[in-house]
Amino acid sequence: MAAETLTELEAAIETVVSTFFTFAGREGRKGSLNINEFKELATQQLPHLLKDVGSLDEKMKTLDVNQDSELRFSEYWRLIGELAKEVRKEKALGIRKK
């Protein structure tokens, strides 16, 4: 990207992508999250949004569309979409302030 200052939304997208690549490939294939990398990302970066999800193993299985026991970026993006929908619902109901 250019050296220009990013907007708040652009910075948020940059963070979502960078976070994936920070955790992806630490143990398994580069560019995808294995179960341990997914759990580490979830517990470190999404502890509040995933607190009621139940088993992270089960959540990974539902996200892992091609059933290869790893999450590619497109599968990870499904999680981000699901979480964004929940945040939107909470905001619409006045539950979430920020």
Swiss-Prot record:
Q: Name one GO molecular function term.
A: lipid binding
Q: Which of UniProt's keywords are assigned here?
A: Calcium, Copper, Cytoplasm, Lipid-binding, Metal-binding, Phosphoprotein, Protein transport, Repeat, Secreted, Transport
- This chain's protein is named Protein S100-A13
* Keyword rRNA-binding among record annotations: no
Judging by the UniProt lineage, the source's domain of life is Eukaryota
Where Ca(2+) 2 binds, per the record, is at 64, 66, 68, 70, 75
Q: Which residues carry this modification: Phosphoserine?
A: 32
Function in brief? Plays a role in the export of proteins that lack a signal peptide and are secreted by an alternative pathway. Binds two calcium ions per subunit. Binds one copper ion. Binding of one copper ion does not interfere with calcium binding. Required for the copper-dependent stress-induced export of IL1A and FGF1. The calcium-free protein binds to lipid vesicles containing phosphatidylserine, but not to vesicles containing phosphatidylcholine.
Stored SUPFAM superfamilies: EF-hand
Subcellular location field: Cytoplasm; Secreted
Residues that, per the record, bind Ca(2+) 1: 32, 37
Q: Name one GO cellular component term.
A: extracellular space
Matches recorded under InterPro entries: EF-hand-dom_pair, S100_Ca-bd_sub
Subunit and partners: Homodimer. Part of a copper-dependent multiprotein complex containing S100A13, FGF1 and SYT1. Interacts with FGF1 and SYT1. Interacts with IL1A.
**Main subcellular localization, coarse class?**
cytoplasm
Any one of the GO BP annotations? positive regulation of interleukin-1 alpha production
Pfam families reported for this sequence: S_100
Question: In what residue span(s) does the EF-hand domain sit?
Answer: 18-53
Q: Which organism is it from?
A: Mus musculus (Mouse)
